[in-house]
A protein has these predicted regions:
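A short helix->loop->beta-strand "cap" motif at the edges of active sites that frequently abuts
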Residues: 110-112
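Conserved H-loop
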Residues: 119
């Protein structure tokens, strides 16, 4: 969807609801934890099962997912993610392709749903 139409807010609202019963990890490559918490708090209480991570490095994210084993992951947004193994800039076709492939492998390997948002 177009920038600014509320994709991030909608995803965060879904995460808040699901985090009442599940361990949910919301990964942002665009906003700080403070910004995300402020937005989440405007929607209501911040759920205990909702965890925030502000990171864009795929290798770091992979390690966290393998260690923490969340039950649901949201990536906001896929264009900000990058792999050190790909020489192009974040947001490039090759980086988005690599990021998508890594998250697909993680979803299958860890048996968890991973939602990918674009800018």
């Amino acid at each position: 969807g177009d920038p600014g139409i509320g994709k991030s807010t909608l995803l965060l609202q879904v995460c808040r609801i699901l985090a009442d019963k599940k361990k949910v990890l919301y990964i942002s490559g665009e906003e700080s934890q403070t910004q995300i918490k402020l937005r989440a708090n405007r929607m209501g209480n911040f759920a205990d099962g909702l965890f925030l991570l502000c990171e864009t490095n795929l290798e770091i994210i992979r390690g966290i997912l393998e260690k923490e084993r969340p039950e649901l992951v949201v990536i906001d947004s896929i264009q900000t993610m990058y792999s050190e193994e790909v020489s192009s800039a974040p947001g490039s076709v090759s980086q988005v392709r690599e990021s998508t492939n890594v998250f697909m492998q993680l979803a299958k390997g860890l048996c968890i749903p991973i939602f990918l948002s674009d800018m």
